[in-house]
Amino acid sequence: MELTQNPSVLELVRKTAELTTPKEIVWIDGSEAQLKSLRKIAVETGELIKLNEEKLPGCYLNRSDVNDVARVEGRTFICSRTREEAGPTNNWMDPDEMKAKLHEILRGAMAGRTMYVIPYAMGVIGSPFAKYGIEVTDSILSLIHIS
């Protein structure tokens, strides 16, 4: 199911899938039914633990993976056209150089996994201040936390 006919978004999803080779692509529609299904999968895989429904209805426990929570300064870069835009205390890299590095890292990265596509808005939809984006991930927890 695709939630958009926007050619730029569809091309981004196509290129990302071509690069990362997922077994399937799921578009997140934001529905309660889909969120419930994702929670069920996360409980089955052990990524979420359902808590006592009587004491804590609708609550789950998620333990962060120690290897997946901290930003590593040495591997965090500001990618802008000029080094000056990154500021004096940040690591900088040319965007084209970073894209080339990331393409190598991401090649086949979702093989055997599901690629989730999440459209989102930062701010009030329709506002002149709203910013719109697309997140592509294979992490069910990312989906649950963004919902």
Identify the meaning behind each predicted range.
Residues 1-140:
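An N-terminal JmjN-like helical accessory module and its immediate linker preceding a catalytic domain
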